[in-house]
Amino acid sequence: MTSPEGAQNKEIDCLSPEAQRLAEARLAAKRAARAEAREIRMKELERQQKEVEERPDKDFAEKGSRNMPSLSAATLASLGGTSSRRGSGDTSISMDTEASIREIKDSLAEVEEKYKKAMVSNAQLDNEKTNFMYQVDTLKDMLLELEEQLAESQRQYEEKNKEFEREKHAHSILQFQFAEVKEALRQREEMLEKHGIILNSEIATNGETSDTVNDVGYQAPTKITKEELNALKSAGEGTLGKAKEVEVKKEIVEKVGQRETLQNSEQEQPKPNTGKDCVDRGVSHPGEKAENQRPAEDSALSPGPLAGAKCEQQVQSQDQENTSDLKNSEQIESHKVTNKSDSRASNSPEQSSCLEGLDSEVPGPTEDLKTDLGKGSFEPCPDYILGQTAEIDKVTCTDSRGTGGNQREDEVQAGDTTVEDQVGTVASGPAKQSKGTENHGESCLKDGLGQSSERELTQEVAEPEEAIVQIPQAGGENTITKADDAEGRDEKPIQAEAQASPGAPINQSGHQDTTGPGSTDAQRTPPHAKERKKQGKSEQQAEALDSPQKKTKNKKKKNKKKKAATPAETCRDANEELNCQDPDVGDMEEEERLQVTDKKQASGSPEQKIRAGSREPVEDPQSGSSGKQNKVEEDGPTEGPTDILDQNSPQCEDREISPVGEKGPQCDTSQIGSEEGHVTSQHGGQAVENHNLDNSDLSGQLEGFNSESGGQAREEVGNSKSKEDCTMS
């Protein structure tokens, strides 16, 4: 009995609280039913037992009552006949009935005992039956719960089985990928072993490649050398870059000091005929290369210290490339110091020209000048450029007034000195810029020779020349007046004779027209040519101040300029239509038509244009707006008359370089356009505004010129120029 209760307790423990309450309710109901059944059975047994006890008494009474009548009847029958003889037989019948009654009572008592025992055993069996039925119910409940657990286990088994299948599939994929990666790694190792490359972070230092790239069998690791270890130890806590920068600064400071002492010592030495020697060396050897001329100039200008300094600077040039910004700043300061000393020490044209050649031949200043001219950056180098060219122009002016007859010789000498300066620049510069610097030399030679050929011309037509300089042609040709055409033919032999001597720059002059916008030739304008622009502007300011009486005439001539502006606009519209049809051929013709209109305006109001030119910088708006196309070829002949006018004018001694003009050579395309718009808004001249508009429109059209049409453009310019000379003569 105890085992089912223990099982029931376990079952109750396993069930939830609600199931436990239901099970307890069922058990309580069953107990109550069993208790009632026991009470009913006990009452029934007691009643049955009472009946059994009462029945023998009733049976005995009933038997006695039945026997008495029978006996009486028997006795009466026996007694009615022979009563005496039948008396013994009646006594024996009574004895038999009593014995049978006793036997019946004994058997009845035995049956009652058996019945009682059967009732007790029946009750016990009933109790056992109820207990077994309760156990069956509990076992049924446990079976249901186990069935539920089995179903849950089966569901979990299915989920685990599916998850296992997924993991198995992923494992197979990863195993396949692992095999592929392993194969790729094996191939990589084979390739590395084939080429002899060893992958190790401790082998290569500072990006050095291993020496075993081309050697298959040799795989020894490259180690840090003793010099690198010493360099790392000497650096200390600071980085290698800072230590190297400090060393480079020290070297630059020492080099600048040596350069200053060298140039000061050379300036103090008297050189009586150095200018003529420079001309002879720069002109008399046309077959020599720029590299052959450079050692001769170095030996003539500096006997010992210059050569030593030059070699030292060439040795240290590799260290200077790593710190180009520091080098440029230090060299700019050195140029300022040396050029101030040059301007104080220069007393003759020969000494100033030779010092200019010396500065161009020293490697340091040459590289600085190369970066200033090539990049067109806004660095403080205009002080250095002005310091040299101002001296040359002032000395040439005084010499032209003093010598008189030797005027042409001095101009040739100045031009040849400039050529020698540019040849020195060619020799010291890199090979990729040799073509551009030789073109500069050729343009400088044209500048010097143009001064000697047009000096007498500009004395007669000084004022019209001032106005025409402001309107240069975009094709590299200069505007020439009637006086220029008349006297230019007589001076052709002089120009040809002067141009025959320097051969190397002139041979390469044919390449200048073919350069497109933004080329190296257009970016490198000689510094003395830029200075002559500034001096021409200051000359025009001086003439405008000295002639206040002409201002009243300018008011009367404004109406003429307004009338002259309309032909320029109509000509510009016609030129735009012609450019749409024939852009290669029509550009030069419309430029010539525009120049005829500009010359009429210049001849009609020269004083007003000189007054406007005194405020407006003499620059080429076409070349500025079109990327300075062919600016080297334009500056040579165009700026020559301006310089000659400065030398022949009475205000030559009193002229000063205006601070506004110093910014002119460094201006780029946007600054030139903004400066022109500002100038036209100040003095409000209709003619100058129309010229700027026409030239800016033509500059946009000239951008379509390429290097292939350069030869055709030059031929058309020559033909149109000859036709123009005939018509104007």
From Swiss-Prot:
Write out the biased-composition intervals (Polar residues). 260-272, 313-326, 344-354, 506-523, 667-684, 693-710
Write down any Gene Ontology CC term. nucleus
Q: Which Pfam families match?
A: LRRFIP
Where in or outside the cell?
A: Nucleus; Cytoplasm
Record field: compositional bias (Basic residues): 550-564
Tell me, which GO biological process terms does this entry list?
regulation of DNA-templated transcription
Function of the molecule: Transcriptional repressor which preferentially binds to the GC-rich consensus sequence (5'-AGCCCCCGGCG-3') and may regulate expression of TNF, EGFR and PDGFA. May control smooth muscle cells proliferation following artery injury through PDGFA repression. May also bind double-stranded RNA. Positively regulates Toll-like receptor (TLR) signaling in response to agonist probably by competing with the negative FLII regulator for MYD88-binding.
Stated name of the protein: Leucine-rich repeat flightless-interacting protein 1
